[in-house]
């Protein structure tokens, strides 16, 4: 089976325990952990550079427009995204086991879905 493209979206519950733990830390503790996290993410990216199709990046504040044209600010779980290639959906999901965004930063999951038609 040829490799397919998969969108990976890291999630973070901004009311959950990992978020609360992060924000309970001092600025110095957050900075130290962020430095370790960035180095670990860079190492993960380097180790997986052959399967990363689009590096993606962090996602900022969200605005939503509904079918009536009303625009509003919303809070969602979406935090970071990237596109990878893998032989199967399960293989794509398993790529993110123990990813630094979950083991060091306060992300609590990764939603992985095929990019249809890619």
What are these language model-derived features?
Residues 1-118:
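Conserved, structured core segments of small domains
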């Amino acid at each position: 089976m040829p490799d397919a493209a998969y969108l990976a979206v890291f999630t973070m519950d901004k009311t959950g325990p990992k978020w609360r733990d992060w924000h309970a830390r001092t600025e110095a503790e957050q900075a130290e952990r962020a430095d370790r996290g960035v180095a670990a993410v860079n190492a993960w990216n380097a180790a997986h550079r052959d399967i990363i199709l689009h590096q993606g990046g962090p996602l900022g504040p969200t605005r939503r427009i509904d079918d009536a044209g009303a625009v509003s600010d919303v809070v969602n779980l979406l935090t970071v995204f990237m596109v990878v290639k893998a032989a199967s959906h399960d293989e794509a999901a398993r790529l993110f086991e123990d990813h630094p965004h979950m083991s060091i930063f306060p992300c609590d999951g990764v939603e992985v879905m095929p990019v249809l038609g890619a």
